[in-house]
């Protein structure tokens, strides 16, 4: 087996596949080393689920392809592997406070608001269903909500490299009224997969900026008709057609980066250890995996480095033999619920749609992001608690459950955060010809998750191409803020700059 390549890419998720594809397009021979059994990372497919002789594709969880995922969609479209996407129609907020349960449509209202960003949230207050969920405390503390939204407009943590150390979104939430606190609590869990108390304020502000506050249509997104696994497998096929190589179940333990020569990656595969060599290495694994490789390879130089936390969560799918009353395809639970978001798969995926058309059944996917004591429950206990809460919302489905399915996802989902300046690895690292890519990597792009993985994968590939004297790839530009949001942002940043200047002059 040839163990010398033009570049070694550690990790076969979206970042690694992106880097490998762009290198292979320029005639280089990359080797992608993936520890798992399939490519794709958190977008990978999993073993199919069999229910009453019907076969359903499985994956890490439903992923939205957001309107701002411009580089990810451009890459797939350029290689003719972007499927016909299914536009999201509505996201519902389901709020429980004690025995009181209310629902309000929020997704379409935000993205189709008549008011410009950042005033588009005001449209929600014209909905009777939304108003019914609020109480007096929400109205009294409404300006605390507005001040947080203004903060998100006036501070761009990723571009400014502003970690806002020690501050969490949970602290901001304490000043809000209960219903609005629960709404953003739910949005935080839905988008960032953890408790607001654990979400760094910098990460939350950047999240708001990218997904909603600067543009109304930033909240628009689509679904993949057959899940993410299909896309990842097609990316892998394209890479191999262009001359790249992918090895599965190949875990990199450490690397030896040498100056001016080949670097070496030491791999464990089927219980055996081997080494491969290349002049360039791109570390494109998830954050916990990257931390392990870096600290094992460079123990002295890496003691002060910061790596964002990886988060675990549970995915529960429930099949029913009837369809519930009219409801949107997705939404969030907040307040006194154990689960945090939901997707009706028979309204999204082709295989589930076909099953629904032939049987009249339905299937929902719900996610549970914590807290830790909830995730520590046994499968039976967790399922019991989820069903108890679920039947509060859909009592008409009680007695119609066909089969449940519980999936525990490992702690690899990135909690967006910025380390103190100088401690958070970017695409270029202190080690020559060792580059990083992934949604955990420090970079000025405003993007998150799949899009950030894709953008940093392209940039890491560009570093290799630049060193080889080959043409680089241009990143696609993100939609600008709407005019009013842009004006407020410029005014606030100008004010911050003037205040800093006055402090320095004293």
What would you call each of these model-derived segments?
Residues 3-32:
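N-terminal Rossmann-like FAD-binding beta1-loop-alpha1 element of flavoenzymes
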Residues 63-70, 159-165, 171, 176, ...:
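Short beta-strand to alpha-helix junction loop
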Residues 24-49:
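Glycine-rich FAD pyrophosphate-binding loop
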Residues 207-272, 280:
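Helical element adjacent to the flavin cofactor pocket in flavoenzyme catalytic cores
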Residues 26, 248-365, 369-375, 380, ...:
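Mid-domain catalytic core of redox enzymes
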Residues 73, 77-78, 82-199:
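Mobile amphipathic helical/loop "lid" adjacent to a hydrophobic cofactor/ligand pocket
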Residues 463-506:
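Active-site-proximal substrate-binding core of FAD-dependent oxidoreductases
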Residues 351-358, 410-436, 440-445:
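FAD-binding beta-loop-beta segment adjacent to the flavin cofactor pocket
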